[in-house]
Amino acid sequence: MTHPIKAAITVGEPNWAPLELVLPARELEAFMYMGRSGEIELYKHCITRRYLNISADGQRFYRYSDGTYVEVTKAVALDHVRNRDQ
């Protein structure tokens, strides 16, 4: 894991590549592109309303906590975004 990241969110042309690398095609339509924070792409799940934050290369995952992005495992990130009961 790396140190927490603080960066402003910018919105521009959607970058779907990181999401396409980590999710099966049948799940992609459940996400909205929300923007970018530094090198982290931000996607929001339409049903759970939770964010899936993925590095631009699709290799690292982050949770937003106390004003910073903290690296988590892929399993933790996917479980968080898919589970409304947490």
Model-derived regions: residue spans:
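Acidic, low-complexity, intrinsically disordered interaction modules
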Residues: V22-K74
